[in-house]
Amino acid sequence: MAATCPSVGKSNYQAVWAVLEDVNGVLQKPTAADYIVPRGNATMNQTPTNSASEELSESLNVTDQFQDAVDAGEASIPMYLRLDPSGGHMQAHALILAAMGKVQERDAVTASLTSEVGAEDDTIPVEDISGGVLPPSGVVEVDTEKVRYSGRTIEDGVVTALTNCERGYAGTTAATHEAAASLTLKSRVYMQDTCRNRVSIWMKDDHTVTFGSGGAVTMTEFSMSNSGGQNVDVTVQFQRMGYCGRSFVSGTPSGQNITVVDSKDRSAVKAYSVGGYIKNTTKNLDNSGAGYRITAVDPVAGTITVEGTITSFADGDQLDAWTPLSSPVGEPLESRRASIYIDGQVGRIREGSLSMGTPAEFLQEIGDEYPGEAVDTKRELSITMNSFFRGDDAAELGKGYDGYEIPVVVRFGKEAGKTLSIGMDRVKMSMPEIGVDGASYTLDRTGAILGAKGEDALYIVQE
C-alpha cells in the first residue's frame, strides 16, 4: 500500500531561517547557515485591515468596505539557545546581530598587562587596549593560559582591570605572567549600535513557506529558570510578506512560465509571491540545490515565471516550496546551567528574565501599499529576578525605594565553548515586591538596564 500524507499541514513539521539582508528591505535567500530550530510553533502574519464605508443609505447595513495600506507584519520565533562548540556563529546569529547592531569577532581585541599577575590572582590589570572593547565578561588568553572573567574595573571610561577571574580555563594551566605580556580576547561580542541590520524571515509550515523582508528585531527575551532548555524568544516586525505553496503543473510550460493548478485542477497562482522558490517534487528537481526562484506571478494567465532550466517539467508534476537542506547548530543548552553575578558576587535567584526591547517605527506614505523603512526608537531594556526572601534581604526594600545601581552578568551554560553571557554595567534596581510561593516568601526585583556613554548598556558575549 502506498504511503500518503494528509491534506492538512502537520503542526509539528516546521523550520525557520533568519537571514541578514545585503540591502535593507530586499528579500534575502536563505542558506543552511541561517537555519533555526523553533521551540514550539513560530508564527508569521501580515493581515490587511479594512475600513467600512461612511456612506449612508436607506439601510443600517454597511454598503462598502475599503482595504487599507498594510501595516508591518510580525513574526514570533521561540527557540532554545544553541551554541557552536567549535566557535562558529550561534543559532540565530542574524537575529541577535539585528537586535544589537554590530559584532566584534574573536581575536580582534588585544591589551597588555599593567603589572605581573600571579597564578592565583583573580584580578588582571590591563592597559593599551586596541582593536575594540573588553566587554563586562568574556574569555581572554595570556600566553597559553585562558582566563574567564565576570567583571571589570573602569576608570574615567577606560577598562583598567578584569575581575572575578577563573584561572586555567578550558583545560589550560594557570601561570604567572610578566608585566607587559600580551592579552587577547577570545570571545565574540555582540554590541549595541544606532544603526542595525534588517533580516529576511523564512518559515516552513509543512507544505507552505511564508517569508518576510525588511525585518526589524523588536524584542529579544532570555528566560532564567531551573527546568527545560534555555529559552530565547524573538519578535520581528517586517515590511512585506510573501508565500509559496503546493501546486501541480498544468500542460507544458512555455519558456519559463508555468501554469499552476491545485489538486482539483483550479488555478493555484494565488499560492505564490515573487521571491519564493519552488522545486519539482515529482522529478526530484531543485535547480542543482538552488531552487527555482519565482520572478513573476500573473493572476490573469494563472502562471508563475521562474529562473532556471525547467524543460523537464511536465503536466501533472507536483511543485513544492524549496528551502535549503539544513542542520541545527550545536546542542540546546539546559536552563539549569545558567548563573548570575550581581555586583561581582554569585547571585541566588529562583527565576527571572532579561528583556531587550528594540522597537522601531515603520514609515508609511501615501501611495505605498506596504510599510517603508523602519526607524529605531528608544530601547527598553530590563531584568527581573525572583528569589526567596531571606532575612538578610530586608535591606533590599529600603535600597530599592531609593534606587541603586549594580553591575550584573547573566551567564548561560558552564562548559568552555558552550557559554553565552550578557553583561550590564548599570542596572538600576527599583522597589521590590514581597510575594508567596508555597511555604516560602519571595522577593520580586526589577532593574532597568541603563547606558553610560554611547551604546554600552548591554553586551552579548559568546565565550
Model-derived features: positions:
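Signature of extracytoplasmic/envelope-associated structural regions
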Residues: 2-119, 123-463
